[in-house]
Structures are given as C-alpha cells and as structure tokens.
C-alpha cells in the first residue's frame, strides 16, 4: 500500500473530452501511416510544451530525441489502448474521495488541459495539496527540475515526520 502519492501533470482529456478523443484518435492513425515525426510535430506545437522549449531548448531537443526512438505503432497502440480508454478525472470522483494518503498534486500554470483536473483532485482527495508552478507546462519535472525536486522532497519530509495532515474543513 502506498504511504503517499505524487501526481504531476495529470488529467489531460478530462476537459473537452470529445475533442480529445477525436484528436488523439486521428493522431494514432497518422502515427501508423506516417511515422513518429507526426507526433513530434504535434507535441512541439502544443501550448503546454512551449514553456519547456523556451526555457531549455537543449533539454527540449533531448526530450524529442528520446521520443523519436519510440516505435510509431507502439505509440499508436498506447494512445488507443490507454489514453483513449481511460476514465476522466471527473469520472474518478468516488475513488478520489476514498484516498487516505498524503497527496501532492503538481501542475504547470501553462498546462491548460491539466489545470482543472488538478483543482478537482485537490478538492476531492482528502489529504491533497496542490502546487502550481509558474510559467511551466506539461513537463514540470523536466522544465523546473530543481524546484520540482525541492517541493517533492519537502512533501516527502512532511509525510515522514507527520506534518502533512488532513484538511480541517471538508470540501464539496
């Protein structure tokens, strides 16, 4: 059983679900027909990826180089088998309310698809706290590694020493 949870950049596809399903379904088809560069071009153009590209061009290129190594067919299967089939964060509300472990939720303020789901999780997980990193996108751990690791370390220390308690007032 987990003693704590760290949730980062989670929930894309929760808001605007129909658009998400259609867009990623098309991307899966294109990956199989045209190869991995299709995904790289799409990822590079997303507003939620811009912060990483602008902050650390070399790191962003390294990230793309690693993605380039992924087999396109496998990537398409992951899109269809996981992303397009998973429940939205909103649909997980009953399960979120039962989580009884300290939880740190991290999101970049430019990761628009994940902001509303992050707020939702923070409101429905009893022992959750939310950290929004400024001028950061979807890869908060890669864009701001020192800041990310500092907050994760502080969270784990608070959990270990019993300083991460529950909220005093229940949320709806």
Per-region residue spans from a language model:
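Conserved hydrophobic packing residues within short motifs/helices of P-loop NTPase cores
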Residues: 6, 104-106, 131
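Short beta-strand/loop motif that positions the catalytic acidic residue
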Residues: 98-99, 105-107
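Hydrophobic, aromatic-rich cap/lid helix
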Residues: 42, 61-92
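Flexible "cap/lid" loop of the alpha/beta hydrolase fold
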Residues: 2-38
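Conserved alpha/beta-hydrolase "acid-adjacent" motif
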Residues: 112-117
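Catalytic active-site module of serine/aspartate enzymes centered on a nucleophile-bearing elbow/loop
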Residues: 127-172
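Cofactor-binding loop segments of dinucleotide-utilizing enzymes, especially the Rossmann-like FAD-
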Residues: 10, 108, 135
